[in-house]
């Protein structure tokens, strides 16, 4: 969602800030801005509605000079997208950027108005600027003012603040929204995502909940919310920003779809040894914890929730462990009963998804056996706060609609299933079949990608459609859910997914010649049941698009289009059948002319509730 970049150096920092914002564009935003202060305290602020490139053009026309600055990309929450609502916000000499939501901004706004402050935006962020300004007038340093202001704010936020009268210092505060400090030589940086700072440093300090940081060119001091100084470890990051060039591809999403064979190879690297899954990276005590697991609770949002839904079938059928999957935003707001020896698994590409993080923190109070995060970003909040963590190693994913992060999550989950089956003393053939399937998966997906042109032609049938229905059975039902999500995310076609057996319980009423029905139908034990559901659609004139392998015995007809897939091992079929649905959504979006990589109203990493 929103992105923050800050810098304090002996050189001009405007280009550092702009490059940082460019690297955060993938998170989604509607406006951008920056403010730079020189050594004499002269501040220049630029804000633009639209892309970072428009802000960069403005900076070329009006050069910004100064060694201290903060910048921001905004994803509108309070107040419409506009230049007036774009960050940074100013209250006299106080300049603020902010990620998150201040839940009590309205009473604070009224109180500040009563003190004589005038608001020029609709945002909750301007409340922070005026509140810090007010507290500073009551005496003390900027840090003192922030320490007094922070307890008055309710909600999740990450904020960076500068005082133009003291351009040698930046202050930052974290409560529920990530901030990371980048350490340089005679210069220091801060951002909401380490990707923004990779061009200038590889050394980072991740702020923890309640931290307040005071940053100068030569020092970083961190305090807790009482003002007591605390120590935070700095780490050397090996994260690679490898997505800057789309190469031969038109969009990042297309590139990331085609990267999946290699991404899955990376996920598997070092984790299969002598025909067994090797997850020794979990540490020496992991086996003891995992061997006690009698139940699994999975929390996730969006695409990650769909991967959790697939894994439920695997955990129960292959490892014999009961598994529940819940949307994180629902879990955290209801009373739940914790089963005996239940393992909490959280799934998140970014590791910063607000609701998933909140669910993890709640689980620590509820008595879960332990927690395991599956994530694509080392050092993220979810990873740091979990007992165990497994990285998907998918590489940077820029497209808002997740592709390779989803398939690599499933790959990690399936490896975990194999490990648990062994720890439970189940038949060794279970792990053997999983390992064999996973090793074959990259080449199977490469085979499937050769069908791209066929899927591109079929996508033309969707050019005038407003609705679509996806069907699947068993562990392919969550893949139907994921296919529907991809189509609605990037083509803006209303799409729903149902377990095929539910057709006659309502969705069948929607079927007519204008309703395309996409079916995921590998040749498995549920195929005959699924064929009956397909006939129900055919009998009512629905247009069918069936993804299946040749052994399934389907034949194309006027209203049934068969997209023949290579045969794959049953255990990896859910991962495999995801890819053609990604391609279908991509090509439909191209025909519709939408913004594939940054679809409207959506953000890559949802760091607010």
UniProtKB/Swiss-Prot annotation:
The active site is at residues 2, 604. Coiled coil: none annotated. PROSITE patterns: GATASE_TYPE_2 (PS51278), SIS (PS51464). One of its GO terms (cellular component) is cytosol. Keywords: Aminotransferase, Cytoplasm, Glutamine amidotransferase, Repeat, Transferase. GO terms for biological process: carbohydrate metabolic process; fructose 6-phosphate metabolic process; protein N-linked glycosylation; UDP-N-acetylglucosamine metabolic process. InterPro entries: GATase_2_dom, GFAT, GFAT_N, GlmS/AgaS_SIS, GlmS/FrlB_SIS, Ntn_hydrolases_N, SIS_dom, SIS_dom_sf. It is found in: Cytoplasm. Homodimer. This is Glutamine--fructose-6-phosphate aminotransferase [isomerizing].
């Amino acid at each position: 969602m929103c992105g923050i970049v800050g810098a304090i150096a002996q050189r001009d920092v405007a280009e550092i800030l702009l490059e940082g914002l460019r690297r955060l564009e993938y998170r989604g935003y509607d406006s951008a801005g920056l403010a730079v202060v020189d050594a004499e305290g002269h501040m220049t602020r630029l804000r633009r509605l639209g892309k970072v490139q428009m802000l960069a053009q403005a900076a070329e026309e009006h050069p910004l000079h100064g060694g201290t600055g903060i910048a921001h990309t905004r994803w509108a929450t309070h107040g419409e997208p506009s230049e007036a609502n774009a960050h940074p916000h100013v209250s006299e000499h106080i300049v603020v950027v902010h990620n998150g939501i201040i839940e009590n901004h309205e009473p604070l706004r009224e109180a500040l108005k009563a003190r004589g402050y005038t608001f020029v935006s609709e945002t909750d962020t301007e409340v922070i600027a005026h509140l810090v300004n007010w507290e500073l007038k009551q005496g003390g340093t900027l840090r003192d003012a922030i320490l007094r202001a922070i307890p008055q704010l309710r909600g999740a936020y990450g904020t960076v603040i500068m005082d133009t009268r003291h351009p040698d210092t930046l202050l930052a505060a974290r409560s529920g929204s990530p901030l990371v400090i980048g350490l340089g030589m005679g210069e220091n940086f801060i951002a909401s995502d380490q990707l923004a700072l990779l061009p200038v440093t590889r050394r980072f300090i991740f702020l923890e909940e309640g931290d307040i940081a005071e940053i100068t060119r030569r020092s970083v001091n961190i305090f807790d919310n009482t003002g007591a100084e605390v120590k935070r470890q700095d780490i050397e990051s090996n994260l690679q920003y490898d997505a800057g060039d789309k190469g031969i591809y038109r969009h990042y999403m297309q590139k990331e779809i085609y990267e999946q064979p290699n991404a899955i190879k990376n996920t598997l690297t070092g984790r299969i040894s002598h025909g067994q899954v090797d997850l020794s990276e979990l540490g020496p005590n992991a086996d003891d914890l995992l061997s006690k697991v009698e139940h699994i609770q999975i929390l996730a949002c969006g695409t990650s929730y769909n991967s959790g839904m697939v894994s439920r079938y695997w955990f129960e059928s292959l490892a014999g462990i009961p598994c529940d999957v819940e949307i994180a935003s629902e879990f955290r707001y209801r009373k739940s009963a914790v089963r005996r020896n239940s393992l909490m698994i959280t799934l998140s590409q970014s590791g910063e998804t607000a609701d998933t993080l909140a669910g993890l923190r709640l689980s620590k109070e509820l008595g879960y056996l332990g927690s395991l995060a599956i994530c694509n970003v080392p050092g993220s909040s979810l990873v740091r706060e979990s007992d165990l963590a497994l990285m998907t190693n998918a590489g940077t994913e820029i497209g808002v609609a997740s592709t390779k992060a989803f398939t690599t999550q499933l790959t990690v989950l399936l490896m975990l299933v194999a490990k648990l089956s062994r720890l439970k003393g189940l038949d060794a053939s279970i792990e053997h079949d999983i390992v064999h399937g996973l090793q074959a998966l990259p080449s199977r997906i490469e085979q499937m990608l050769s069908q791209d042109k066929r899927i591109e032609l079929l996508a033309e049938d969707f050019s005038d459609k407003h609705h679509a229905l996806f069907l699947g059975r068993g562990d392919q039902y969550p893949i139907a859910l994921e296919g529907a999500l991809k189509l609605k995310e990037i083509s803006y076609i209303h799409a729903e997914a149902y377990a095929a057996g539910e057709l006659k319980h309502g969705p069948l009423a929607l079927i007519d010649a204008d309703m395309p029905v996409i079916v995921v139908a590998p040749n498995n034990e549920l195929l005959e049941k699924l064929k009956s559901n397909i006939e129900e659609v055919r009998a009512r004139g629905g247009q069918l698009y069936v993804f299946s392998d040749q052994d399934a015995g389907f034949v194309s007809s006027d209203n049934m289009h068969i997209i023949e897939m290579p045969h794959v091992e049953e255990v990896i079929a859910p991962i495999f059948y995801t890819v053609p649905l990604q391609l279908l959504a991509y090509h439909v979006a191209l025909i519709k002319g939408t913004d594939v990589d940054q679809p409207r109203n959506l953000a890559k990493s949802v760091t607010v509730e």
